[in-house]
């Protein structure tokens, strides 16, 4: 079993066959420098007869406030959203290209469940988890991140609800954190 400590939260425990810590992987290291990436990819098997889901998870301990009266608040918020966009998109791309064997030795680096993933019907979720964030602060983040990832959602045909922003309380309810 794997647990991941990030941004003041403990994610997991997850089966080591279903969790790929992409941020700390040799695969990510080989793509450096300058490739920002999410923390991990997690296969969440849904109900019987439904396709598997891969949750690509980025964790943060705080976010900028877009409604702040500070002069650079909007710019800071836009930069934050751009960073999360890049991390989630890079993790999606690097994870899928590893699954299809585009990287040398990817099969040896990937957890077992990722090697046989039916990518043509796998559901992908791009997930941001913010520790200690109030529920009422989530909708503006959800909207901004969904807008930033709209091209990705369309080109990858991810479908409605593919971008998810949650706080630690919701993450706990969904079994992401202990």
Regions found by a protein language model. Give the residues of each.
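Polybasic (Lys/Arg-rich)
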Residues: 134-178
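Catalytic cores of nucleic-acid endonucleases
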Residues: 62-129, 133, 150-156
């Amino acid at each position: 079993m794997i647990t991941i400590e990030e941004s003041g939260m403990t994610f997991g425990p997850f089966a080591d066959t279903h969790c790929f810590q992409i941020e700390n992987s040799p695969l990510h290291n080989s793509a450096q420098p300058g490739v920002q990436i999410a923390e991990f990819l997690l296969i969440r098997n849904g109900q019987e007869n439904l396709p598997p889901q891969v949750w690509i998870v980025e964790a943060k301990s705080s976010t900028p406030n877009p409604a702040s009266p500070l002069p650079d608040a909007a710019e800071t918020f836009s930069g934050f959203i751009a960073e999360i966009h890049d991390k989630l998109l890079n993790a999606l791309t690097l994870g899928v290209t590893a699954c299809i064997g585009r990287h040398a030795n990817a099969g040896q680096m990937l957890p077992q469940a990722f090697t046989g993933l039916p990518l043509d019907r796998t559901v992908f979720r791009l997930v941001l988890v913010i520790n200690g964030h109030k529920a009422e602060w989530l909708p503006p983040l959800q909207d901004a991140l969904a807008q930033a990832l709209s091209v990705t959602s369309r080109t990858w045909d991810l479908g409605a609800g593919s971008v998810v922003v949650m706080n630690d309380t919701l993450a706990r309810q969904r079994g992401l954190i202990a």
